[in-house]
Amino acid sequence: MRYSVGVVGQPEHLAAARRLRAELSPAVYLWINAAEGRTYTDAEAADWTALDPHFGYSRNAHLSAGRACRTGESVVSVDGDGTVRRCHFVPEELGNLYDGSYRARLGPRACPLPVCDCHIGYVHLETLPLYEVFAGGVLERIPDARIPHTR
């Protein structure tokens, strides 16, 4: 079974995150999410990057308006009732999974949001190399085995 483990990068979580990294198998990727609304100094970012070499992708929101994104073409978000949206963060409905009405609205389109600050969204921006970085599992945050993720 493939899996990764994550921690929100709050200062009070750093010691526990270090212990967790020490206890996890080196084969398990420990990812650090930047805390929503938090700005990290370079020193703080270095602490988190020592645990997660890919923390830099999470550290700052990504400009996304008008940029190519895989959502709505090869990636969708589905609610329990079958409502299909291009992205978890874009409220516009494409249709319904169960009746197939979403299919006619699939296609390439630019992101309508000014910024994207969550992995489940920005991982699909075509301007970022994250499909290559997380080639082992994009949404699961499983890095490409050829890219070191521990130090």
Set out the residue ranges of the language-model regions:
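Flexible mid-to-C-terminal extensions adjoining Fe-S/redox cofactors in radical SAM and related proteins
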Residues: 83-151
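Radical SAM enzyme [4Fe-4S]-AdoMet core and its adjacent flexible, acidic
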Residues: 1-81, 85, 89, 95, ...
